[in-house]
């Protein structure tokens, strides 16, 4: 189950990868800014994705399939999918607006 958005970064200050959980991906960058981090100088963005109920990081594509399998899409997003043609095996990316 998709539980929250997350951004994986490489923290140059601490010399390690970190995952920042958030409601929307842009919130992670606001959090970093609040702590005085500057993109490129203090951290490098690795990937935007989501966390599951076990705090495992998923790519946007893996999270889309997880949300689909767990029936988590908003009704508006389900309606949008019904209006467009897409092949069920075509990889899609999940955006937080699709699930909450």
Feature annotation, model-predicted:
Residues 1-48, 52-100:
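Linear-motif-rich, low-complexity cytosolic tails and juxtamembrane regions
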């Amino acid at each position: 189950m998709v539980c929250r958005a997350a951004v994986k970064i490489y923290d140059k200050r601490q010399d390690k990868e970190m995952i920042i959980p958030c409601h929307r991906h842009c919130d992670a960058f606001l959090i970093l800014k609040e702590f005085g981090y500057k993109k490129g100088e203090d951290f490098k963005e690795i990937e935007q994705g989501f966390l599951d109920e076990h705090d495992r990081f998923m790519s946007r594509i893996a999270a889309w399939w997880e949300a689909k399998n767990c029936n988590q899409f908003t009704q508006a997003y389900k309606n949008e999918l019904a209006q467009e043609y897409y092949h069920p095996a075509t990889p899609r990316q999940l955006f937080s607006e699709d699930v909450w």
